[in-house]
C-alpha cells in the first residue's frame, strides 16, 4: 500500500508540475507540438490556440517537433492556425515530419523559422485497408484526393508548383534547415529567439 501511495503521490506531483508548466506556457503565449499527431494532441493544441486568441491578438509562438501522424488531426491544427486572428510564429525543432510539416506550413512564410539542426520530411499520405474491393477502391480515391490537396497546400507554402511537390514527395523527401530555406518552406534559420521578427515590425 505504501508503494501505491508513493506512486500516486508521484503521479499527482508530476501532474501538478505539468499543469504549472502549461499555465506558464499559456502566459507567455507558447504552444508546443511535440510527439505524434493524433486526435488528443490536436484537441489540446486547438484549445490552447483558441484560448490564447480570446485573450489578445498578440502573436503566438508554436514550437514543432513531430514525426507526424494522422493527417486529419494535422488538418485540425492547420485550420485552427489559419482561423484565429493572432499570427502564429512557427519554430521548427528536431524533426518536422509528415503531418508535423503540414502544421508547420500553416503559418505565413515570413513567420516560419527553423533551428539549425532541424530536419523536415514531406511525403505522400499512406495507409492500409482491408475489406471488399469496392471499399478499397473508395479508400484509394480518397488517398489520391488527399495527396492532391496536400500538394496544393505545400505548393502555396513554398512557392513550388503542385507538380514539383508531387514529384518530390513520391518518396520520402528530407530537407535539412538550409535546404528547407532554399525550397521555400522555411523563411529563416535562427539560433536565438532574439532573431525573430515580430509581425508588423
UniProtKB/Swiss-Prot annotation:
UniProt-annotated catalytic positions: 98, 123
Record GO biological process: protein quality control for misfolded or incompletely synthesized proteins
Gene expressing this chain: clpP2
Keyword Calcium part of the UniProt annotation: no
Gene Ontology CC: cytoplasm; endopeptidase Clp complex
Family: Belongs to the peptidase S14 family.
E.C. number(s) listed in UniProt: 3.4.21.92
HAMAP family linked to this entry: ClpP (MF_00444)
Record keywords: Cytoplasm, Hydrolase, Protease, Serine protease
Species per Swiss-Prot/TrEMBL record: Pseudomonas aeruginosa (strain ATCC 15692 / DSM 22644 / CIP 104116 / JCM 14847 / LMG 12228 / 1C / PRS 101 / PAO1)
Catalytic activity from the UniProt record: Hydrolysis of proteins to small peptides in the presence of ATP and magnesium. alpha-casein is the usual test substrate. In the absence of ATP, only oligopeptides shorter than five residues are hydrolyzed (such as succinyl-Leu-Tyr-|-NHMec, and Leu-Tyr-Leu-|-Tyr-Trp, in which cleavage of the -Tyr-|-Leu- and -Tyr-|-Trp bonds also occurs)
Protein name per UniProt: ATP-dependent Clp protease proteolytic subunit 2
A Pfam family assignment: CLP_protease
Top-rank EC class of the record's enzyme: hydrolase
Quaternary structure, from the entry: Fourteen ClpP subunits assemble into 2 heptameric rings which stack back to back to give a disk-like structure with a central cavity, resembling the structure of eukaryotic proteasomes.
Keyword hit for Coiled coil: no
PANTHER family in the cross-refs: ATP-DEPENDENT CLP PROTEASE PROTEOLYTIC SUBUNIT
Role of this protein: Cleaves peptides in various proteins in a process that requires ATP hydrolysis. Has a chymotrypsin-like activity. Plays a major role in the degradation of misfolded proteins.
SUPFAM superfamilies assigned: ClpP/crotonase
GO molecular function per UniProt: ATP-dependent peptidase activity; ATPase binding; serine-type endopeptidase activity
Subcellular location: Cytoplasm
Amino acid at each position: 500500500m505504501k508503494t501505491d501511495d508513493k506512486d500516486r503521490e508521484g503521479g499527482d506531483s508530476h501532474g501538478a508540475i505539468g499543469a504549472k508548466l502549461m499555465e506558464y506556457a499559456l502566459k507567455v503565449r507558447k504552444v508546443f507540438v511535440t510527439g505524434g499527431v493524433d486526435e488528443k494532441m490536436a484537441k489540446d493544441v486547438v484549445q490552447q490556440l483558441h484560448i490564447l486568441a480570446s485573450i489578445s491578438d498578440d502573436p503566438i509562438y508554436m514550437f514543432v517537433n513531430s514525426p507526424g501522424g494522422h493527417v486529419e488531426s494535422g488538418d485540425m491544427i492547420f485550420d485552427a492556425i489559419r482561423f484565429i486572428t493572432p499570427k502564429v510564429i512557427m519554430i521548427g525543432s528536431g524533426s518536422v515530419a509528415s503531418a508535423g510539416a503540414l502544421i508547420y506550413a500553416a503559418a505565413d512564410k515570413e513567420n516560419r523559422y527553423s533551428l539549425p539542426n532541424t530536419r523536415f520530411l514531406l511525403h505522400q499520405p499512406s495507409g492500409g485497408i482491408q475489406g471488399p474491393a469496392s471499399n478499397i477502391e473508395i479508400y484509394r480515391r480518397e488517398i489520391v484526393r488527399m495527396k492532391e490537396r496536400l500538394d496544393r497546400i505545400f505548393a502555396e507554402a513554398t512557392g513550388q508548383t503542385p507538380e514539383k511537390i508531387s514529384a518530390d514527395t513520391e518518396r520520402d523527401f528530407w530537407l535539412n534547415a538550409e535546404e528547407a530555406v532554399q525550397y521555400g518552406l522555411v523563411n529563416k534559420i535562427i539560433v536565438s529567439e532574439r532573431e525573430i521578427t515580430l509581425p508588423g515590425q
